[in-house]
Structures are given as C-alpha cells and as structure tokens.
C-alpha cells in the first residue's frame, strides 16, 4: 500500500528554498508516530534536506544518480514493494504528484499559516476519490518556528 504523509499551509505549500517553511513540533511528532518502523520513500531533494537518516525507518531515495549514502529505488521498484508492505511517500512535490494515482491513504496536516514565496506544493486531493478519515489543523505553539 502507498501512503502519503505531508504537512501543508493554508494554500497547500509544502516547501520553500529546498526546505520545510516551518518547524512545527506537533506535526513532527505526528510524522514520527506514523512512520516509525516503516519504509519511507523520498526524492533526492528531500533526502538532501534531512539532517541525516531518521531513526528506526528504512530510507529509499528516488534519484537519477548513484548514491553511496542511502539506498536508491526506481518508480517501478516502489510500486512493486508497495504490493508487499506499506510504503510512506514523504516528498517532495514531484514525488507526491508521481505517486498520487497509486496512493491509497493520505495523512495531511494543515499548518495554520500562509507561506510567502513558497515554491513547492502538495498535490491537489480529489475528495471524490479520497475519503477524509482524520484531519489535523495545527496552530503555532511557543516551541514552533514559522510566521503565522
């Protein structure tokens, strides 16, 4: 099964200048809870934006070049693997759009803000295809870093 997980702002933005436009503790805890022990798939840019491997998760990166620092996988490889177990698609924008037609579940957190000059966006979700089973809108707390 393919499952997407992402946080977006009120305008569907997920990135700015190659990084998340916020540090939102509630969403990071939610992401960890859902993906811990699982397999996460991401594009090269998302991989390079991480501080390193996230603990207790298998990391697979889609890229056109060989890498020594992480295991890589093809589009077809992701689809084949998703027949055997749940795969979490964690970004970025191109990867979300690529796998949206094959996605069975989406975990979306809406960050209560509007990011100026965002350059990466989550895919538009057709609510005739996807049923919302859980929806989170999180507001800024004292531990969070972003403009609201």
Task: Give each language-model segment a name.
Residues 1-148:
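Enzymes that bind and transform nitrogen-containing heteroaromatic metabolites
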